[in-house]
């Protein structure tokens, strides 16, 4: 991976297609950087033969004309001009809107590359917006989350973060940490006078307050990440209980192979579906049983791993046969081993059960979980199951209304590290340890918070974040 400069100075001219590849009514090709106005002048002619130069054009102006390459006209286009610093990247930018055929777009982009641009790298436009100070790192990530949002809640959360709500909250906390750090470091300059510029009692209260705010953000990740990643719902149970049939029923199409032969599913299958504004990441797992067969054994091991990562377990039982007490005991054991996961017991094949009502009552009593009667192959009970699943995560679609919410694992880990540093600082304050030791922990917390907004950043971190963007964003 090539290293890219961290400096926010205007970079070389870059160009890329900003709209999805394929056939459409319109497409956009954009340029940014040093010299893009001159490059635009080389390829664009305004309609009607009017004398025109992009170097003289006002910002936020639109111009209709033709764009040509060395072989002649490529297309009629509309050119939008953005003058530095009033652009997304804070550099000079030009965007060409053309017809959306892939050949047209390819020729237009090539004309810009032949005239002096280089092809932009993934996320380079947004990267330049961050480096120039137009947005912070958290807002840059929010743009990516907004683009990839699959539910209304995920979209609204990304919009809130893009507007800077969490950034402002973190900045306020960072200002408090900086103030305490500055007072401690001032003490070091006057160490011979043995003076405290902030009493240790006041410092302990301030650090405790800031740690409490950070811990509240850490706790918000528990539900917040479900908005962007979806609810991890694992379908588990014994072989041939109907797990794959249930997966297909929930998805509304055949995704998994269904067979009467036990052990057909050797590895887990993951798919997503959306119900009542909530996205569920469904995982169909291998049947849970003892097996000496190597491949099936590995599949079962992976099943238990996915169960351990689940937010919601759908434990499916074949109610047409088997010992219900044994099945209830197995469900209880799974729930006890994974108390952080919610569980729904799905009594499948109730159309074949001799006493479905009594069996449901028994399972509800012995598992203390919601029990849904189903005939997955017929779709019976499917709507009730979906409603129960949505009810288990009730309120998730309203989480985006919170003013600040952590949805990213990167942000969660940085905040957790910051909270640990503040915990260390509190212990040092209580023990009346030297100011330099306390200041070190506060500085560590500052750095962790700074990693989120980009105040403290490395080349590797920037590459990791922006390489996930598409070219043109």
UniProtKB/Swiss-Prot annotation:
Domain annotation TrmE-type G: ranges: 230-394
Top EC class, one word: hydrolase
Residues involved in Mg(2+) binding: 244, 265
Cofactor binding summary note: Binds 1 potassium ion per subunit.
Keyword field contains ATP-binding: no
Keyword Hydrolase included in the entry's annotation: yes
Any single GO CC term annotated in Swiss-Prot or TrEMBL for this entry: cytosol
Biological process per Gene Ontology, one example term: tRNA wobble uridine modification
PANTHER family per UniProt: TRNA MODIFICATION GTPASE GTPBP3 (PTHR42714), TRNA MODIFICATION GTPASE GTPBP3, MITOCHONDRIAL (PTHR42714:SF2)
Binding site for GTP: 240-245, 259-265, 284-287
Subcellular localization: Cytoplasm
Role, per record: Exhibits a very high intrinsic GTPase hydrolysis rate. Involved in the addition of a carboxymethylaminomethyl (cmnm) group at the wobble position (U34) of certain tRNAs, forming tRNA-cmnm(5)s(2)U34.
MF term (GO), any: GTP binding
Subunit field text: Homodimer. Heterotetramer of two MnmE and two MnmG subunits.
InterPro entries listed in its UniProt record: G_TrmE, GTP-bd, GTP-bd_TrmE_N, GTPase_MnmE, MnmE_dom2, MnmE_helical, P-loop_NTPase, Small_GTP-bd
Similarity-based family: Belongs to the TRAFAC class TrmE-Era-EngA-EngB-Septin-like GTPase superfamily. TrmE GTPase family.
Organism: Chlorobium phaeovibrioides (strain DSM 265 / 1930)
CC cofactor: K(+)
Main location: cytoplasm
Known EC number: 3.6.-.-
Gene3D superfamilies to which the protein is assigned, alphabetical: P-loop containing nucleotide triphosphate hydrolases, Probable tRNA modification gtpase trme, domain 1, tRNA modification GTPase MnmE domain 2
Name recorded for this polypeptide: tRNA modification GTPase MnmE
Domain of life: Bacteria
Binding site for (6S)-5-formyl-5,6,7,8-tetrahydrofolate: 30, 95, 134, 473
């Amino acid at each position: 991976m090539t290293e890219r400069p961290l400096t926010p100075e205007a970079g070389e001219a870059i160009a890329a297609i900003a709209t999805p590849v394929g056939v459409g009514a319109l497409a956009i090709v954009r340029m940014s950087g040093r010299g893009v106005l001159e490059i635009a002048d080389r390829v664009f002619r305004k309609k009607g033969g009017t004398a025109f130069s992009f170097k003289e054009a006002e910002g936020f102006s639109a111009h209709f004309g033709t764009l040509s390459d060395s072989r002649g006209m490529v297309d009629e286009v509309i050119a939008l001009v953005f003058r530095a610093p009033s652009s997304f990247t804070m550099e000079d930018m030009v965007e060409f809107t053309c017809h959306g055929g892939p050949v047209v777009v390819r020729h237009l982009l090539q004309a810009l590359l032949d005239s002096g641009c280089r092809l932009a790298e993934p996320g380079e436009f947004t990267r330049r917006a961050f480096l120039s100070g137009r947005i912070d790192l958290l807002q840059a990530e929010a743009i990516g989350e907004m683009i990839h949002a699959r539910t209304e809640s995920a979209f609204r959360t990304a919009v809130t973060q893009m507007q800077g709500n969490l950034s402002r909250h973190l900045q306020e906390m960072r200002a408090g940490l900086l103030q305490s750090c500055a007072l401690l470091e001032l003490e070091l300059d006057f160490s011979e006078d043995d003076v405290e510029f902030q009493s240790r009692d006041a410092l302990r209260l301030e650090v405790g307050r800031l740690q409490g705010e950070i811990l509240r953000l850490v706790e918000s990740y528990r539900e917040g990440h479900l908005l962007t990643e979806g609810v991890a719902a694992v379908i588990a149970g014994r072989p041939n209980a109907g797990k794959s049939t249930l997966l297909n029923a929930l998805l509304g199409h055949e995704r998994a192979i269904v067979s009467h032969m036990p052990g057909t599913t050797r590895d887990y299958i993951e798919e997503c579906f959306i119900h009542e504004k909530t996205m569920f990441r469904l995982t169909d797992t291998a049947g849970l049983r003892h097996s000496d067969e190597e491949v099936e054994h590995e599949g079962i091991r992976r099943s238990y791993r996915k169960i351990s990562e689940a937010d919601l377990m759908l434990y499916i039982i074949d109610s047409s046969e088997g010992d219900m007490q044994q099945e209830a005991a197995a469900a209880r054991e799974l729930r006890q081993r994974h108390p952080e996961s919610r569980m729904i017991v799905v009594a499948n094949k109730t159309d074949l059960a001799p006493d479905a009502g009594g069996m449901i009552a028994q399972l509800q009593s012995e598992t203390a979980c919601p029990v849904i009667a189903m005939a997955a192959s017929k779709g019976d009970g499917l709507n009730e199951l979906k409603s129960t699943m949505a009810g288990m995560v009730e309120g998730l679609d309203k989480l985006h209304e919170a003013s600040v919410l952590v949805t990213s694992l990167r942000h969660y880990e940085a905040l957790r590290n910051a909270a640990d540093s503040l915990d260390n600082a509190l212990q040092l304050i209580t023990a009346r340890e030297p100011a330099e030791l306390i200041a070190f922990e506060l500085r560590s917390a500052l750095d962790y918070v700074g990693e989120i907004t980009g105040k403290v950043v490395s080349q590797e971190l920037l590459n990791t974040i922006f390489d996930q963007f598409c070219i043109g964003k």
